[in-house]
Amino acid sequence: MSDSSRSLIPSFLYSSDHRLFQATTMSTHLKSQPLISPTNSSVSSNGTSFAIATPNEKVEMYSPAYFAACTVAGMLSCGITHTAITPLDVIKCNMQIDPLKYKNITSAFKTTIKEQGLKGFTRGWSPTLLGYSAQGAFKYGLYEYAKKYYSDIVGPEYAAKYKTLIYLAGSASAEIVADVALCPMEAVKVRVQTQPGFARGLSDGLPKIIKSEGFRGLHKGLVPLWGRQIPYTMMKFATFENTVELIYKKVMPTPKEECSKPVQLGVSFAGGYIAGIFCAIISHPADNLVSFLNNSKGATVADAVKRLGLWGMLTRGLPLRIFMIGTLTGAQWVIYDAVKVLAGLPTTGGASPATALAPSVSA
């Protein structure tokens, strides 16, 4: 690749000393050990070996392997965390849908135990796992791609000057696609969690919605979902990136590159939790709306406002959601960055001020 086809990208957008990825002669560098032997069936007929890189092998920044690693990390971070908090999600959704019956967290917990037993807290786990795994893959993978792509378009000077706009534009672009993947599973999840007897889970809930409402029934909540998730994700990524940068500049006594990996992952959790609090507040009215529309056949936005009230739309279930989303977002960034570290990549955010030479992302 010629110099003209490469672009200088401000390293604040990516949290590494780029020399870690460009140096080819390091006395401490371990030899690459492919997971798949070149003598086995992974070698194609033309002699090309398709080996998966081990953690000791170098992954070039912004290469296809880099974006693939970020996609897998995003899939794991969102799928695992959202499934783990299914019990809290059950309580939250029921409080949003039927505030007269589920008046607060305590009464919602007691009512669920009384009517459904402990099993009631696991309702909807399978569509949650599948839906948010798909969403996480697109969200994080496309965010990293879009962040690099928009930086290439504006150039290093404007990317440095308007870095927060890069974060916002990249995260919004990624979330638009990610929600299309999430929406069908979200529709099934809400029905299963808030309508006892509707279905046992994904296997019978999905066909039931398709039979009664057609495939449109799986996507009727897409626009409200965008209304909830796009502001949420923009806040999540922009706040996280800036918070982590601030922590390394103002709080940590040593530069990021001198901090141990556990310390860096701790910073990722702190930045994620702070970002999650802001995410919960800005996206909560739309979250109430999504739950109401997915639970009520033929319901409109006006019906939701009339039933819940404007104040209820803003506050119903908010304390629980702040705790849930704060913990969730912090854990997501830890898992995401841990997977990147295992792949030999840097954690996200808080880079040193040096610039890095990196391949351009083609349109």
From Swiss-Prot:
One GO location term (cellular component): mitochondrial inner membrane
Gene Ontology biological process: mitochondrial phosphate ion transmembrane transport; response to salt stress
Mitochondrial matrix side: 86-123, 186-220, 283-321
Tissue specificity of this protein: Expressed in leaves. Strong expression in senescent leaves.
Subcellular location: Mitochondrion inner membrane
InterPro entries with a match to the protein in the record: Mitochondrial_sb/sol_carrier (IPR018108), Mt_carrier_dom_sf (IPR023395), SLC25A3/Pic2/Mir1-like (IPR044677)
Protein name: Mitochondrial phosphate carrier protein 2, mitochondrial
Gene assigned in the entry: MPT2
